[in-house]
Amino acid sequence: MREKIFNIFKSFGENLFQFMKHQPFVIGAIILCFFLFSFFGEVVDDVLEGDSHVLDEKILLMLRDPDNIQSPLGPGWLEEMMRDFTALGGIGLLTLVTAASAIYLLTVKRTRHAFYLLSVVATGTILSNLMKIGFDRPRPDLVPHDSITYMSGFPSGHSFMATVVYLTLGTILAEAAPRKSLKIYLISIAIFIALTVGVSRVYLGVHWPSDVLAGWLIGAGWALAFWILTKYLELRHILRKDQAKTVS
């Protein structure tokens, strides 16, 4: 029995070594993924213990007009722009973007990428809903909500799913990009959109800042964990790489 257990761990260690040998940059991804999930755990502890509440209130009120707490800080066009930004993380648009992207990937014979995208988004959606039900944290009541809400606040579903969807699409596009600068640009755009969605949720008063921070962390960690898993399965020849032309 001991020998069997030893062989299992030995085989896993050898596979992990080969994985890191062929994909050295994945080591950094694993470390980053561990950091993201650990930081998320710290945020959860702070929220459950109430340690984040004072800072949450302070940041939320900083974004409101001091003379009229009913209105967000800044001109009317900024509020309208924030509503547009928050829509980028809405379930309707994300579903449309995911479906359209998956159909395109299937059309150009990038089947593995299509199912990779659908798997990350589907499991992310389930996880987001389960966490909202489990934590059941009330949304801010200090200011009026400038956007319609349906579920509890923690973590921010818009921030979580925007990070998952756009970061996953960014990595798929980056894989086909011929230049490193273009890869960095695509990933940067994905991160920028996710950050913008999260900021808009706090600005509109529908989430505490800690809700949004948690959404970013778990969303990035979830997308990154799936990417690492995919690379590992490719190395083990469990998944076959798509033969796709690079994007020029």
List each model region and its residues.
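N-terminal transmembrane-helix/juxtamembrane module of multi-pass inner/ER membrane proteins
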Residues: 1-92, 139-145
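Membrane-embedded catalytic cores of phosphoryl/pyrophosphoryl-handling enzymes
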Residues: 3-4, 140-248
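Hydrophobic, membrane-inserted alpha-helices
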Residues: 13, 80, 97-103, 170, ...
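Membrane-helix interfacial "entry" motifs
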Residues: 14-22, 76-83, 105, 109, ...
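Alpha-helical transmembrane segments of multipass membrane proteins
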Residues: 33-37, 124-128, 196-197, 222-227
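C-terminal TM-helix exit segments that contain a strictly Trp-centered aromatic cap at the helix terminus
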Residues: 37-46, 127-136, 200
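Membrane-spanning helices that line or support transport/gating and their immediate boundary helices
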Residues: 43, 58, 118, 130-134, ...
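Membrane-interface loops
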Residues: 53-67, 96-180, 184-188
